[in-house]
Amino acid sequence: MKTIYKNGAVYTGKLPLVEAFAVEDGKFVFAGSSAEADALAAAGDKVVDLGGKFVCSGFNDSHMHLLNYGSSLLKAQLAAHTESLEDMLACLDTFQKEHPRKDGAWLMGRGWNQDYFTDVDRMPNRYDLDRVSTEVPICATRACGHCLVVNSKALELLGVTADTPQPEGGEIGMENGEPDGRFFDNAMEPVYDSIPVPSKEEIKDMIRSACKALNSYGVTSSQSDDYCVCRAVPWQTVNEAYKELEDSGELTVRVYEQSNFTDLESFCLLYTSDAADDLIGVD
């Protein structure tokens, strides 16, 4: 059974615009005039009158960290609360109260930028986040993704002290000889590795959130790198999450994955699996 759309202004990628198109089994099978569409219609087909509306194909994001984006949407949205340090801390505190976490879970936020602070001329530090909580580990990532800050509870769990060596390709922020809660670039990896590993259902929630947000902007396909985002999560688990969402009709963005593997075994296993199909591609 086809769905026929007619009486529109449809851009197919070429000019001139056409009036109608038809979709069958999730694929475009026709584009042309409304008269041709009427002639194509068969018993049982659904016909939609576009009423002169403009239609174009969905947008593609060619550099999209989809799973990471979905994860960020489930954190405190600090980008909307970065006019001041106080605004940022209030956002984290409100998020903590409105989103109860299971035992051991960290309070996460992303999007702050000290360049926009009007009350202080510096980055936030561990002592600032301690005002939100000294019992719950907190991690707040800067808008750029190359810096984060944690509170004292998180530093305790990480085991970072004044004697912790500086990592290659990164930096642990220090003040008066003590770690101040800031981590830069490669120094961030141990922090993320210490955060409890998300379950497959939590990964599916991240993908759902990302798809919903992308669809709201008209994005229906993307190139991503999700297999190595959560290093403690096997790529197979991420792929299973995608497959299950596809099977349930919830995967509304076509994804082409960059495998980004560092070992030949995983690479060969991926390419001999059933990871790829119409909605999920791999490279």
Where are these regions (language model features)?
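Divalent metal-binding segments
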Residues: K2-K6, Y11-G58, S62-L269
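Single conserved hydrophobic/aromatic residue that forms the stacking wall/gate
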Residues: Y271-D283
